[in-house]
């Protein structure tokens, strides 16, 4: 085994997905605690105290208590190198989340045990399932009264079509929570006990010693009944199915009280896969431990350091080893680029990195070379990773600078924020209008907030409302086709498209111009 292969096998790169408020950021914090990265976990609820979650680093995230960008955090744990991508739960930021899911080898799905599977979780699950990567489930908020565990397991199959296999089982919940029956490790983990007293061994029949006080508790007896039912009618643990994404190991716990999180993390590190091969150049397989360095840009973030007004391109290394000063080729342009400055992350904090391997996420200081979806490679052979998803916006607004004397900062801010990919920029086809398009309303609020706070440029947004965006072949375009109901604009690449007032306006256009072909993005 080569040193590179050995290093790659230590990597565990995963994203955490959930519906807003299911506790995703809190469980991330607890993992960082176990990784020795932070001394205390700050939950979103603590925002009045000025104590914020490590992964919520942007000013607007701290102000509103929601994650709106994907954070990257890295730490060592049990001889493994952990790379966590904490994705935004808010549905308006699904673009950032979808792209992030292209850069991971596994996903952790956090579910509120009182609510079960919620719409955003379902949406994100579909993307992960499509990729065929393993999914690990953490049923959170066991410190509150919630739904029956058997119902939660059944819901995984009913709503998501994936087998759930219980790795542990609650002994009570809410105020009556006593502990977890740890099926995988044949022990009971007691709630609110210190390390030495936390675990009670089970005998070969899966039962506590009779002199244990908990053994006489009716909640424990009820749990044993559930365990018997699981053995008879539940799914059998199958690692092969897990790695294919056909079965999900299910762990119960409470991220807020840090209960069951360590057990979950230990199991995850052992079960989750190391970086896998990628399909490149259309249909070629590229091994993660291939000696030639390559990777792809899945995210661009401006102003991670507000003092320097910088831009960072986040790169998932797909193969080989990164070394400081390495010369690579940018596949899109064929131009050589020397990678002198690379960084690793703890949210907005960063550390200079001199080497990294497949599976790692590195940040490259970007002076405008990179775009989301770019492939880079160090060898002579061109390597191009699959295109990342791009979404058709649904809401559009005209944007102007409030202060006409600040056009320079207005243009700089707008261009940098657009390059991050959460909001898209269009120009009037025969006017100088700037039009922004986004998947949801919150993206405009974030844009406006960041323009003011990061670029000192207040903007005015004039709504065009919900529009149906459809691209048109330039050869078929006649500017006279445009009207107030189907606004003609061009995208960042200069490609023409119509913004239809509604589906009816689109149908009317198609009836009038039956030979014109209109296309949409994702």
From Swiss-Prot:
Record-annotated tr-type G domain positions: 9-276
Predominant cellular place of this UniProt entry's protein: cytoplasm
Molecular function via GO: GTP binding; GTPase activity; translation release factor activity, codon nonspecific; translation release factor activity, codon specific
Gene3D superfamilies according to UniProt: P-loop containing nucleotide triphosphate hydrolases, Peptide chain release factor 3, domain III, Translation factors
Manganese in keyword set: no
Keywords: Cytoplasm, GTP-binding, Nucleotide-binding, Protein biosynthesis
UniProt GO cellular component terms: cytosol
Cellular compartments annotated: Cytoplasm
GO biological process: regulation of translational termination
Database matches in PROSITE patterns: G_TR_1, G_TR_2
Binding site for GTP: 18-25, 86-90, 140-143
HAMAP family from the UniProt entry: Rel_fac_3
Family of this protein: Belongs to the TRAFAC class translation factor GTPase superfamily. Classic translation factor GTPase family. PrfC subfamily.
Name this polypeptide is given: Peptide chain release factor 3
